[in-house]
Amino acid sequence: MNYIDTIKSITPLSLDDIIKTAKQHVPAQYRQTPWNYPGLAHGTAILQDEEQLCCYLASYGEMHQGKLACAFTKFPYLNMDKNIEIIDWGCGQGLASIYFIDNLRQYNLLEKLQKVTLIEPSYAALSRAELHLRQAVGDSVYIETLNYYLPSTVESLKANAIGGIHIEEPICIHLFSNILDIPQIDLKELAYLVSSSGYRHYFVCVGPVNFGNER
């Protein structure tokens, strides 16, 4: 089976399942060094095809999982007393959302999750993220996909940048995973978008260790 068919055979899908499956579908010549696959750019490129997506997960998936584990260590799960929605900014293949959903399931809170919004400029990665989320939550959660860049300081990207969000549930979890350190992102405009509603917001931010980066 190919990657998509394998993922569709796993319900409910977890982050461990995703990483394991991706490693199984790395091209043979890159099995030992998936990070050398052309076009990954050390994990910063906008991915375009299935092999790139699998090689990214095989290269960086476990490291990403470890950083998410640290970020969610003190998450206030006991405060999740109303319906929840997730907005995954620059979601890539949806790893942060999947990790959070894994945790909601462990805390018996998954039934409170009503909506997930996935925002990502790579159509290939966004399609993967939607597939992953659907296998993780089934049809009980509304999944919205938005194929946009985050607010940008680069003129050529502004026309394709997201201009607004629609929050429906009383609790909104914002996930920023390996995205806020990118210098082209307009943090001021992003902050405006996030603060445009009066709902209860929680922010989980994960980034690479870039010494000297003051963002």
Task: Annotate each PLM feature.
Residues H42-L78:
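Class I SAM-dependent methyltransferase Rossmann-like catalytic core
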Residues S122:
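Conserved SAM/SAH-binding beta-strand->alpha-helix loop
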Residues E169-I185:
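A short SAM/SAH-binding and catalytic strip from SAM-dependent methyltransferases
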